[in-house]
Every structure is written in C-alpha cells, then in structure tokens.
A protein has these predicted regions:
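Surface-exposed peri-terminal alpha-helical interaction modules
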Residues: 1-135
Length: 135
C-alpha cells in the first residue's frame, strides 16, 4: 500500500509545517500582547483571549489533520486536496476564506522573518500536494 504510505507521509509533512508556522505566529502575537505570565496563563490566553482568536482557524485545521492521521480509515485520496485548499484559503494563494485572518497573516509575513521562513517551508510542502481541479 505505497499510496497510503505516501498519503500519510505527505500529510505528516503538512502537519509539521503547519505546526511550525502556528508556533511562529503565536510567538509574534505573544510579543505583541506583552507579558503573559506562566505557561498555563499563556495557554489560557491563546485559547480564550480575543487577541489570539484569529489563530483558531489554523489551530482547527491542524487538529483536524492530526485526527485524520490518527484514523487509518480517514486517510482517503481526496484528503490532500481538501487540506491544501483549506490551508491555501487561509494563507494564499487561493482567494481568502477568512479576510481577517488573511490581513493579519500578511502583516505578520512582513513583520517576522520566522513567520516568512515558516510560510516558505509550508509553500514547499503544499506544492507537493495535488491541487483541487479548476472549476
């Protein structure tokens, strides 16, 4: 089942690239926010404070992707296309699925070299996945 192994491997690469990007975005947002206190207080802020709310879309994609990786039956051929389209709707180049996310994301791309590097790595991973057919 080489195709299944390739599918799993491709999605694992995507998951890692998304987590790296997510961490870079959280680090920058945390700097913008200011002192957050303990790790527990930081976690509470990230999950419930409006300042970090825009990142929840990306968190949700990562969570869904990781759930699919844990469920062998969820690994279906179209999954790569679906996740590629979903991610590209957030970070580009597809039209924005969430305009607020896209604006904040683009600002961070310009403000943070770490975000820009993580974005570049993510784009390389996405380029390896099949694209959705053109309408």
């Amino acid at each position: 089942m080489i195709e299944g192994k390739t599918l799993r491997s491709d999605l694992q690469h995507l998951s890692r690239a998304l987590r790296t990007l997510h961490k870079a975005l959280l680090d920058v947002e945390t700097q913008y926010f200011g002192n957050v206190g303990s790790a527990l207080e930081h976690l509470q802020l990230v999950t419930s404070h409006p300042h970090f709310a825009w990142l929840q879309k990306l968190s949700g994609i990562i969570s869904t992707l990781d759930e699919c990786l844990d469920d062998e039956e969820a690994l279906v051929v179209d999954l790569e296309r679906r996740f590629r389209a979903e991610v590209e709707g957030l970070v580009g180049p597809l039209p924005a699925s969430d305009e607020d996310f896209r604006q904040r994301y683009n600002a961070m791309l310009h403000d943070s070299p770490d975000v820009a590097m993580a974005h570049g790595a993510l784009r390389k991973v996405l380029a390896q996945l099949p694209a959705a057919p053109a309408d």
